């Protein structure tokens, strides 16, 4: 969810690819944009990723950005003063953004994307160039990073990793993988 300058609330619709808007006074949600549906098979060969409209963020000019988890992409679209969105255009699509989830702009106007499938953070330049900034183990504990928000020069990243027993031996003994829900930080 994200608010625009006029107080409209925007909500992503996940698999539907829809972006909804609720006006400042509340009421029913209106569909204002649509990202085309897409499904991708994950590396395990079994799991299907079909979430196309996920994290949302506005830049300083009022352009709406949408994380496309299934494609590993970010879309952008103009939003008019009436809260209606224009046609989505692809800003970037890159394997570095596999599992694109949360979006946020820092104080310098850089777009940050959490890549949950890669346990990474990337930035996307206005020309669509994608750069990896942190990966699990390099800047802190990133375990299925989901959302990101900046407060001053500090980015806070929510991790949704669930502890699981993936390394069990035949007797059912093994290490508990995953750190569970947590918050990571990155300082600019």
Regions found by a protein language model. Give the residues of each.
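Beta-propeller fold detector
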Residues: 29-37, 85-93, 131-136
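Surface loops at the rim/top face of extracytoplasmic beta-rich domains
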Residues: 4-35, 64-71
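Beta-rich, blade/repeat-based domains predominating
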Residues: 1-9, 16, 38-64, 94-111, ...
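Short loop/turn segments that connect beta-strands within beta-propeller blades
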Residues: 23-27, 78-83, 124-129, 187-188
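Short, conserved, GDST-rich strand-edge loop motifs in beta-rich repeat architectures
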Residues: 160-178
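A beta-strand-loop signature enriched in Asp, Gly, Thr, and Trp
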Residues: 84-117, 123-128
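Structural signal for beta-propeller blades
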Residues: 17-20, 72-74, 119-121, 164-165, ...
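Short loop/turn segments immediately following the C-termini of beta-strands
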Residues: 14-15, 69, 79, 116-117, ...
């Amino acid at each position: 969810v994200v608010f625009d300058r006029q107080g409209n609330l925007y909500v992503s619709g996940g698999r539907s690819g829809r972006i909804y808007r609720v006006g400042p006074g509340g009421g029913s949600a209106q569909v204002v944009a649509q990202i085309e549906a897409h499904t991708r098979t994950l590396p395990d060969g079994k799991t299907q990723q079909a979430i196309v409209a996920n994290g949302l963020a506005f830049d300083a000019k009022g352009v709406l950005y949408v994380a496309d988890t299934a494609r590993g992409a970010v879309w952008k679209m103009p939003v008019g003063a009436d809260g209606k969105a224009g046609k989505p255009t692809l800003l970037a699509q890159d394997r570095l953004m596999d599992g694109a989830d949360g979006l946020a702009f820092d104080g310098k106007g850089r777009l940050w994307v959490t890549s949950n499938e890669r346990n990474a953070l990337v930035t996307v330049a206005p020309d669509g160039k994608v750069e990896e900034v942190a990966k699990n183990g390099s800047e802190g504990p990133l375990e299925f990073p989901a959302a990101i928000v900046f407060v001053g020069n500090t980015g806070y990243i929510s991790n949704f990793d669930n502890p699981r027993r993936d390394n069990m031996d035949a007797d059912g003994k093994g290490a508990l993988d995953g750190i569970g829900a947590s918050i990571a930080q990155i300082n600019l």
